[in-house]
Amino acid sequence: MAILFFRSPHLHAPRFPLAAESVNTLFGAEAFRLRLLELIAGAEKRIYLTALYLQDDEAGREVLDALHAAKALRPGLDIRVLVDWHRAQRGLIGAGKQAGNAAWYRALTSERATEAPIYGVPVQTRELFGVLHLKGFVFDDCVLYSG
């Protein structure tokens, strides 16, 4: 039996080849926003977004509007948005009493003819113990990371 004690565990991890030229780096929030909207508009099979939350502000509305526009153009498009459940239940800290983003998600869903479901994922029992803070996005066979 071979002793793998001094070998890197990464040598045996599942993997697939990735050419360096297939990786692009975006510099700045505006470049990320434009690429995100471009990928949403161009997706043909699937869009999976994970984020801490989508805020009821200009940026959040722009993303959700783009998702619904893509779904309207391609009704078979599989769209799923995953956000932290606890974070969606409250508004911005210091902004006074707010219903939270979950209320906005529900209202938006009820007023749209298209479906782009937003799932709240309760990672912990309370927000202070940890949140869903993944920043990965899948568009067909393209992966986009943020942060």
Predicted regions and their residues:
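Gly/serine-rich nucleotide phosphate-binding loop at the start of the catalytic core
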Residues: Y53
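HKD-type phospholipase D/PLD-like phosphodiesterase module
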Residues: F5-G42, D57-G147
